[in-house]
Amino acid sequence: MDVTSTLSLGDPLEPARKATADMLRSRDHSFSLPQPFYCDQRLFEIDMQEIFHKEWLIAGMTCEIPAKGNFLTLQIGKNPVLVIRGAEGQVHAFHNVCRHRGSRLCVSEKGKVAKLVCPYHQWTYELDGRLLFAGTEMGADFDMKEYGLKPIQVKTAGGYIFISLAENPPAIDDFLATLEHYMEPYDMENAKVAVQTTIREAANWKLVIENNRECYHCNGSHPELLKTLLEWDDVTDPRASQAFKDQVAACTSAWDAEKIPYAHASFGLRNRIVRMPLLDGTVSMTMDGKQGSKKLMGRIKNPDLGSMRILHLPHSWNHCMGDHLIVFTVWPISAQETLVTTKWLVHKDAVEGVDYDVARLREVWDATNDQDRRLAEENQRGINSDAYQPGPYSKTYEFGVINFLDWYSERMLNNLGEESAHVRKVAGS
């Protein structure tokens, strides 16, 4: 008998859970969070359990596992995860843990296998998770059907792979249907990752997202990014000028001609998709504003499509141009440590050194990511001070941050089993 299965150690985080709910219910929604949300390891553990283990996350792109047996791995808190392409082309996700004695099955970030074989004692699994071989000494009453890999919820749409560690994750199909439609012109099954980077930021994951959700800091911090990016979120942005609105109107005619979706679509505060122009005379997020890849994505014929921006909370933002896409994902490590992964995707037939130069492709966002890292880290250092107290957000410039923290508060209270106040979306988002 497994005595640990009946042994209850209690929940050492229970006092912190109650404190978390109390602080969220009483917080001023126009101010930053109380200090423990950014600094305390106990609240970080609650973030992982109630947000990252219960919400939908972007694990990767379907083009990263194009054929049977292709896999990718990732780490979500203490949980190693495996995503693999099955025999019939399906995408499967499993806990990357052998059912024998718990060793990780796949140790590399990406690869290709015929079967999943544990490196410890060679227990062998089919690509759909079924146990095929467990040696010959497990006893007559051993039933291999009871020891398949533990599955993880997985959905795909528009070339993205979404996973959730929860048994009953929140509904997401309405967003995925829209994402599939908006991504159709890019034909993501015929894309590839040209280059990928991961940087470590000495800051809480929420500070990383907060920094992304506003461009209040852009003029003073991001000269490379502002060579092409128009900082307004869309035409409802309270900062948007009439000239910007006129530019959007002119661009929509061209997008209609190309049958390119562009209308703002939001799904609560968690998801939004919108296509916005880049700076007039530029077509891609490069230092000179020219194409980063000569070969355009999918069925796209005109490189001047602006940038389609995709938000997926809690951890991803994306820019989709005519010639390449950039996918960002945020992975919490500890209360004050976060990984930020950036992937640049191009057409699968684009040839490095001929159609695109990797250094040029990544130049703008390498600089921007490093600038954002420094901003988040300095933000964290200040918040650690005894002098910190929550400060006010600008509803004109920081509405995206307000919306993120409202989403976070609502989901945290919901997942803790607590009631939350009605969350109002701030205009411009």
UniProtKB/Swiss-Prot annotation:
UniProt record, GO biological process: glycine betaine catabolic process
Phenotype of null mutants: Deletion of gbcA and gbcB abrogates the ability to grow on glycine betaine as a sole carbon source.
Catalytic activity: glycine betaine + NADH + O2 + H(+) = N,N-dimethylglycine + formaldehyde + NAD(+) + H2O
Gene3D superfamilies: Naphthalene 1,2-dioxygenase Alpha Subunit, Chain A, domain 1, Rieske [2Fe-2S] iron-sulphur domain
Subunit structure: The system is composed of an oxygenase subunit (GbcA) and a reductase subunit (GbcB).
Family affiliation: Belongs to the bacterial ring-hydroxylating dioxygenase alpha subunit family.
Physiological role: Involved in degradation of glycine betaine. Part of a Rieske-type oxygenase system that catalyzes the conversion of glycine betaine (GB) to dimethylglycine (DMG). This subunit is the terminal oxygenase component of the system. Required for growth on choline and GB, but not for growth on DMG.
Protein name: Glycine betaine monooxygenase oxygenase subunit
